[in-house]
Amino acid sequence: VFSMQWLDGDSDRLARMESVIRETAEEIADTHEMALKYGPLLGLEPVAMDTYLREALEQSAQEHAPKQWRVMPSGALHDATNVSALMPAAMLFVPSIGGISHDFAEDTKEDDLMMGLKVLAGAVDRLI
């Protein structure tokens, strides 16, 4: 069993990526005489996060961590996607050690967690 997740904020690009992934998987399966079966796809559309909340996070990041942050339009299917149907939502990411994410080995340096909290607090201050 092998699973993949690919993310983007553009649904057309997601469809093109899926096509390339399927074609590549089929080529590999044919080369190695392997059976290939696809499970159910979520089929959820990416949702843009709230502009006002994102701007507050960006301004706070610039204040607390100048030149150490970037905008990351993930289009990810996080809880924020479901929440955004009911209320404004945005996401704040902090770096994982070694870039390992969504894995039991995922970890984050305490300094990065503290900086993330400062950025979040600064954004909240701007919003209230």
PLM features: what roles do these ranges have?
Residues 1, 13, 17-24, 49-57, ...:
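General structural feature for long, well-ordered alpha-helical segments within catalytic domains
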Residues 35-95:
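Active-site-adjacent substrate-binding region
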Residues 1-19, 26-29, 36-43:
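Midchain, well-structured core segments that form catalytic/ion-binding scaffolds
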Residues 12-13, 18-24, 67, 94-128:
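His/Asp/Glu-rich mid-to-C-terminal helical/loop segments that flank catalytic regions of hydrolases
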